[in-house]
Design a protein with these regions (language model features):
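Short amphipathic alpha helix immediately N-terminal
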Residues: 135-163
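Arg/Lys-rich amphipathic alpha helix in sigma70-family domain 2
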Residues: 86-106
């Protein structure tokens, strides 16, 4: 099979097929170039300390390739390969982190309990990463600040208004415009995804 010189120009299924067949060039480009920002973000959200990227991604790759790449063969194209890979990576790294905690006797049991159910954490981590990505697409960083403080951090409106040098009434107007802008960006992203799927 002949590939382009950029995995971004390949279809999702072409990438999966190339990974399953252990194509060295595609494997390197995908895990160490194209998906590097994605995996770095996942590791930053999952681990509270710095980890070795190459080491952890190599282990993740071996995990995917176990039993004749059975996990890669589960990709069905219902989402993009990057969205799918993000969820798989989050699950893997949360399990790895929790396993490392289990091996550390000095960690208090309450700390382990506070981490909650892994499935819930996968969903929360995925949602946080999706929101941060949408924030990065918003040109008006004041809107991002207002949504982050009022919605995500649930800060008091009076305090946020003071931080922005405005009043509460104006702050609510800013919040309304900010959520409208965020919704428009999210809908545009969904539309782009649907167009890619139809190709």
């Amino acid at each position: 099979m002949i590939y382009t010189k950029n995995t971004k120009q390949m279809t999702d299924q072409q990438i999966i097929d190339a990974l399953i067949s252990r194509d060295e060039w595609v494997t390197y480009q995908f895990f160490f170039k194209t998906c590097r920002p994605l995996f770095v973000s996942v590791m930053r959200y999952v681990f509270s300390y710095k980890v070795d990227y190459d080491e952890f991604v190599n282990e993740f790759y071996l995990h995917l390739m176990e039993n004749d790449a059975i996990r890669l063969r589960q990709f069905q194209g219902r989402s993009t390969i990057y969205q799918w890979m993000k969820v798989v990576a989050i699950r893997y790294f949360i399990a790895k982190r929790d396993n490392m905690i289990d091996m550390e006797p000095k960690v208090a049991l309450t700390e382990c309990a506070e981490r909650g159910d892994s499935f819930d954490e996968v969903q929360k981590t995925t949602a946080r990463m999706d929101v941060e990505r949408l924030f990065s697409l918003m040109p008006n960083k004041r809107y991002v600040y207002v949504i982050r403080r009022l919605v995500l951090e649930e800060a008091e409106p009076n305090k946020v208004a003071e931080e922005l040098g405005t009043n509460v009434d104006n702050l609510y107007n800013i919040k309304k415009r900010a959520i409208s802008a965020l919704t428009e960006i999210a809908l545009n992203e969904v539309e782009k995804y649907e167009k890619r799927r139809r190709k």
